From Swiss-Prot:
Main location: mitochondrion
Subcellular location: Mitochondrion matrix; Mitochondrion
Keyword Zinc on entry: no
EC number, UniProt record: 6.1.1.2
Phylogenetic lineage: Eukaryota, Metazoa, Chordata, Craniata, Vertebrata
Catalytic activity: tRNA(Trp) + L-tryptophan + ATP = L-tryptophyl-tRNA(Trp) + AMP + diphosphate + H(+)
Binding site for L-tryptophan: 167
Gene3D superfamilies, per the entry: HUPs, Tyrosyl-Transfer RNA Synthetase
GO cellular component terms, A-Z: mitochondrial matrix; mitochondrion; nucleoplasm; plasma membrane
Cross-referenced CDD domains: TrpRS_core
Protein name from the UniProt record: Tryptophan--tRNA ligase, mitochondrial
Length: 360
């Protein structure tokens, strides 16, 4: 699955080089050396179908493409809104189990808990001292999230994107897989790196976005909005841990329209098109192949077909999650080892930052 145009260009160049080397050359995947990928996910809430197709599948693939891949469970970000401490502790372990079950491999990537690496917050403070207040107040996500909180939102929520920038820059990350709703935050990351470099000399690379080719999975109950962990309608979101019976029920109740034919027309038939997009993503088929193979089915039967495809996709993952959650010591060890590896990378970067800023 193509993730961004630069990758396509690299693959073409490798192919050309292989042709010139003669019949002994191979086209085996090669990892990008000297480049670092970073991404993070909040531990709160259960991963849903949209998270999996829009982010986690890409994370798994990136492990095979880059030498250094760093994934963080960003617990500090999660406390920008109120959390129950006991629930949060369990959620961190649960998210670790989910990521491992989905294919995140600690032998191929670094998986760690954000709060265990103090360089994140230390660098965040330095970057906070470089950004103007209006810059943060004009970010779309701040406006949307602050509107949902009492008293206009917290300072932590406002400076969330600066901590996000520190997460990325403290590893000198070169690439960041992001969704469409994070593009504005990536612009802030690049601006902060650029500002730091202009003030203290060239130090941080300007991270590039890796945009997934998977469009946002829509709510099953309202295809005009994206699928969300926090949707109050329990039938709107398919969670990765849902039982087969729950998945069938949710797809059976999914909103489509009064036309029975299965077509892919996102602008005029959002509900059915969402079903087709999900079906294509979990089956590995193209949208066109899915539509052709579904000819003759009405939407009621088609929704059950999509449900079966999702159940088949999630069955081994769900089984592995249940197994991993039984061994909390193993999950804690994964995070402990990952945090040590992450700190080993972040510490020398921040030591250099301190020298440049003059706070050694």
């Amino acid at each position: 699955m193509a993730l961004f145009s630069v990758r396509k260009a690299r693959e073409c160049w490798r192919f050309i080089r292989a042709l010139h080397k003669g019949p002994a050359a191979t086209l085996a995947p090669q990892k990008e050396s000297g480049e670092r990928v970073f991404s993070g996910i909040q531990p709160t809430g259960i991963l849903h179908l949209g998270n999996y197709l829009g982010a986690i599948e890409s994370w798994v693939n990136l492990q095979e493409e880059y030498d250094t891949v760093i994934y963080s469970i960003v617990d500090l970000h999660s406390i920008t809104v109120p959390q129950d401490p006991t629930v949060l502790q369990q959620s961190i372990l649960d998210m670790t189990a989910v990521l491992l079950a989905c294919g995140i491999n600690p032998e191929k990537s670094i998986l760690f808990q954000q709060s265990k690496v103090s360089e994140h917050t230390q660098l965040s403070w330095i970057l906070t001292c470089m950004v103007r207040l209006p810059r943060l107040q004009h970010l779309h996500q701040w406006k949307a999230k602050a509107a949902k909180q009492k008293h206009d939102g917290t300072v932590g929520l406002l400076t969330y994107p600066v901590l996000q920038a520190a997460d990325i820059l403290c590893y000198k990350s070169t690439h960041v897989p992001v969704g469409e709703d994070q593009v504005q935050h990536m612009e802030l990351v690049q601006d902060l790196a650029r500002s730091f470099n202009q003030k203290y000399g060239e130090f941080f690379p300007l991270p590039k976005s890796i945009l997934t080719s998977m469009k946002k999975v829509k709510s099953l109950r309202d295809p005009s909005s994206k699928m969300s962990k926090s949707d109050p309608d329990k039938l709107a979101t398919v969670r990765i841990t849902d039982s087969p019976e729950e998945i069938v029920q949710k797809f059976r109740k999914a909103v489509t329209d009064f036309t029975s034919e299965v077509t892919y027309e996102p602008d005029s038939r959002a509900g059915v098109s969402n079903m087709v997009a999900i079906h294509a993503a979990v089956s590995g088929l193209s949208v066109e192949e899915v539509v052709r193979s579904s000819a003759g089915l009405d939407t009621a039967r088609y929704k059950l077909l999509v449900a079966d495809a999702v159940i088949e996709k999630f069955a081994p993952i769900r089984k592995e999650i249940e197994k991993l959650k039984m061994d909390k010591d193993h999950l804690r060890k994964v995070l402990l080892v990952g945090s040590a590896k992450a700190k080993e990378l972040a510490s020398p970067v921040f030591e250099e930052v301190k020298k440049l800023v003059g706070i050694l």
